[in-house]
């Protein structure tokens, strides 16, 4: 990215997660240099200073999408939005950073997967990014590579799949080992929470019944499958006192499990996504196959139409914590790989461009949350959990100048005809959203303004993340100090101890005689 010019964002309402104030924001060398009133020098702007008028608008920290899959090779295809097109679309929606996933095959090297994803992303990204790394199998090699990734590669989060049997799924014992390792090295464990065994059996049942269309995808992965795995993951994480992050929370029942666990004091965070907050699974029964197929994702959207409203309420009240998109897009011809078998439809939907507007519409415009909570769930909480704060997720002196000038009264209609993503379908088609990004600034450079991009591939950069994020590990460390079980001190037992005798039955004795007679 070229050296950014000096910027003065003047007269807007600066919104952080904990307060709002009308103020000017001075940006220099890619970071916020000053925040206050009347920062414009007398006599007007000096040479080299560009003034952006934000009067009547909101000035927000750039969004952080915690969950994307750009150009992901999956289910026989590759997601159509690559790191260039996907991050460019993100900027147009007010998101200035994504966290993608490096996912090795079973038996593959985590470090090699990480380097592969870096080689794909670094030349293409238009905004800053980081990487989670998936643990798809377990061995001493995996254990050692996790440590190397944390110490040398800037990774502090690892994802485990409880679904996708025979592809990415790990066992409960492997979860226990991976969670234990995450805690040792100061990372946060993430899980895709679905019962993979039940899904596999459910899919066989649906196909045997002649159900081959997209509706079969949801029917074989009901809410209970997600809720059971969510509770199981929380139970295992609690057993080793490891912080846990549940990705793409899609159902009311799974969300309730997380909410209950948080109220019980568990260190667990839930991530609903734009799709689960903005639409529902009734689309799987649409008469147009391509329409239904474009909504197929895992876990699936839920057919209960009250689900988005329920999840938004929990998000507004801190039972759920962050928002991602699970942006993993496939065009219609790619989805058609499963035209005769729903298990072969590549899983994934859009969202990276529309997340901020959808959450504003469904959350703030509806009255469920205020502007500060919006900033928390779209940016700040993610920055805190993944140890990017206050460099990211806040407008403050010294923070990266990732900033969005937001028009809360403006509206836009979402459509595949006008969006900037490569995919030819949009699950939010026709939704009218209040809340529109007017200007997006990435590390001090105006990269999107009034529908025009000023960015090229490679302008973004990889952001390393350190382990032991205080936001999540302060409680973990204190619990280790004060809550570790200790033995009861008691006098040794000095009484009689019974002698165990071998119980040999008549049948056992006869069998033994036969074995001796017939060696």
Curated annotation (Swiss-Prot):
Catalytic activity reported: 5,6-dihydrouracil + H2O = 3-(carbamoylamino)propanoate + H(+)
Q: Quote the record's binding site residues for Zn(2+) 2.
A: 159, 192, 248
Top-level EC class:
hydrolase
Which SUPFAM superfamilies does this chain map to? Composite domain of metallo-dependent hydrolases, Metallo-dependent hydrolases
**In the record, which positions carry N6-succinyllysine?**
256
Q: Write the signal peptide boundaries.
A: none
UniProt PTM:
Carboxylation allows a single lysine to coordinate two zinc ions.
Q: Which GO terms describe its molecular function?
A: dihydropyrimidinase activity; identical protein binding; phosphoprotein binding; zinc ion binding
List of residues binding substrate: 164, 347
Q: What is its EC number?
A: 3.5.2.2
Where is coiled-coil annotated?
none
Known cofactor(s): Zn(2+)
Its function?
Answer: Catalyzes the second step of the reductive pyrimidine degradation, the reversible hydrolytic ring opening of dihydropyrimidines. Can catalyze the ring opening of 5,6-dihydrouracil to N-carbamyl-alanine and of 5,6-dihydrothymine to N-carbamyl-amino isobutyrate.
Write the protein's name.
Dihydropyrimidinase
Organism, scientific name: Homo sapiens (Human)
């Amino acid at each position: 990215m070229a050296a950014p010019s000096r910027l003065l964002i003047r007269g807007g309402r600066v919104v952080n997660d904990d307060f709002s104030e009308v103020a000017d924001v001075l940006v220099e060398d890619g970071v916020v240099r000053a925040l206050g009133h009347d920062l414009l020098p007398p006599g007007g702007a000096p040479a080299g200073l560009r003034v952006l008028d934000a009067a009547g608008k909101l000035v927000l920290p750039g969004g952080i999408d915690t969950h994307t899959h750009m150009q992901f090779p999956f289910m026989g295809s590759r997601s159509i939005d690559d790191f260039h097109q996907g991050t460019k679309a993100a900027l147009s929606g007010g998101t200035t950073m994504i966290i993608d996933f490096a996912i090795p095959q079973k038996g593959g090297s985590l470090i090699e997967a990480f380097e592969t994803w870096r080689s794909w992303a670094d030349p293409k990204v238009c905004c800053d990014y980081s990487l989670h790394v998936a643990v798809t199998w377990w061995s001493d090699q995996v254990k050692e590579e996790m440590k190397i990734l944390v110490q040398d590669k800037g990774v502090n989060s690892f994802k485990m799949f409880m679904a996708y049997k025979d592809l990415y799924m790990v066992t409960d014992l492997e979860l226990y080992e991976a969670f234990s390792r995450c805690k040792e090295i100061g990372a946060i464990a993430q899980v895709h929470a679905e019962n993979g065994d039940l899904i596999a059996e459910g899919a066989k049942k649906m196909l045997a019944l002649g159900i081959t269309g997209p509706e079969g995808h949801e029917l074989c992965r009901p809410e209970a499958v997600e809720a059971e795995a969510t509770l199981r993951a929380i139970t295992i994480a609690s057993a080793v006192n490891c912080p846990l992050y549940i990705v793409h929370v899609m159902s009311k029942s799974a969300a309730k499990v997380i909410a209950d666990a948080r109220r019980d004091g568990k260190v667990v965070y839930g991530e609903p996504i734009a799709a689960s907050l903005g639409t529902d699974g009734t689309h799987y029964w649409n008469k147009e196959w391509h329409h239904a197929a474009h909504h197929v994702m895992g876990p699936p959207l839920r057919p209960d139409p009250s689900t988005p409203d329920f999840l938004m309420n929990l998000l507004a009240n801190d039972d759920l914590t962050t928002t991602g998109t699970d942006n993993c897009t496939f065009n219609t011809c790619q989805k058609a790989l499963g035209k005769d078998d729903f298990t072969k439809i590549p899983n994934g939907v859009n969202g990276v461009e529309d997340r901020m507007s959808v959450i504003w519409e469904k959350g703030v415009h509806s009255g469920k949350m205020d502007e500060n909570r919006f900033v928390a769930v779209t940016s700040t909480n993610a920055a805190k959990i993944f140890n990017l704060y206050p460099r990211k997720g806040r407008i403050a002196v010294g923070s990266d100048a990732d900033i969005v000038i937001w028009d809360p009264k403006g509206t836009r209609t979402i459509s595949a005809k006008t969006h900037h993503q490569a995919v030819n379908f949009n699950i939010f088609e026709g939704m009218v959203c209040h809340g529109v990004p007017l200007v997006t600034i990435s590390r001090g450079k105006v990269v999107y303004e009034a529908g025009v991009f000023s960015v090229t591939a490679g302008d973004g950069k990889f952001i390393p993340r350190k382990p032991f994020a205080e936001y999540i590990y302060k409680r973990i460390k204190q619990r280790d100090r004060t809550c570790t079980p200790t033995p009861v001190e008691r006098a040794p037992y000095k009484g009689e101890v019974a002698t165990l005798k071998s119980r040999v039955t008549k049948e056992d004795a006869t069998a033994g005689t036969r074995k001796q007679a017939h060696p």
